[in-house]
Amino acid sequence: MFRKILFLLFIQCFLAQNISGNIEIKARTAILQDYLSGEILYEKEPDRSIYPASMTKIMTSIIAFDLIKSGDLKLDEKFIISEKAWRLSTAGYSSMFVMVGDEVSVEDLLKGIIVASGNDACIALAEGIAGTEEEFAIMMTSKANEIGMLNTNFTNSSGINDPDNYSTVKDILIMSNYLIRNHPEYYKWFSEIEFTWDRTGGDPITQGNRNPLLYKNMGADGIKTGYLAVEKY
């Protein structure tokens, strides 16, 4: 019988068999954990380096949630959208569709990241918190090291392809556990099916959650998917 919550982090394919059987998967690296007990049920090269793609956004969210928890950031605080953030919304990447000069609340940016996987929202949040995305990436890597992600380095807030933005499925598991244990009140956002943002006060944009597992009636409640041409899903 499946436990209440299981985390499966994988590259390129879904786990094809029941966890109690002999598992054969095509993924180069994978890890499966019973969240409640902490038991690792399956792993395959868990320390192999990968490009985390949009799973990078888990750490982007964690940085913001930690600051909110400490009182150094507020959900209703607004950040002004820079040209750098806007350009990502016009470059074919997953986006929240912000415009230069928009003033967007931290809550909307976070939901734009978590639900719509907006790369533009990531940059806006990073710049609002740290001044530059580069400084924010330093904060991300520092946090990763602090919580035991010893084979991870972040160079950007969105996971856009960069050979120096890397992690492992084991480290992504550590990061995911940290998110759920320390910020349960916000974790529910990861299972929201859609996000609506009305930048003009009359022309709302509604986007569905980028996590396809949420639509499969299999009990998934998150967390994040990622795709890069070099890694696939």
For the regions a protein language model found, what residue spans apply to each?
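Compositionally biased, intrinsically disordered low-complexity regions enriched in proline and serine
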Residues: C13-L15, E43, L228
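Sterically constrained small-residue positions within well-ordered secondary structures
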Residues: F7, G21-I23, Y227-A229
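Sec-dependent N-terminal signal peptides
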Residues: K4-C13
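Active-site-adjacent loops and short helices of periplasmic peptidoglycan-processing enzymes
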Residues: Q17-L173, N177-R181
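Domain-terminus/edge residues, biased toward the C-terminal soluble/receptor-binding domains
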Residues: M149-L150, N161-Y166, K170-Y233
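Hydrophobic alpha-helical context, especially transmembrane and signal-peptide helices
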Residues: F7, I25, G92, R210-L213, ...
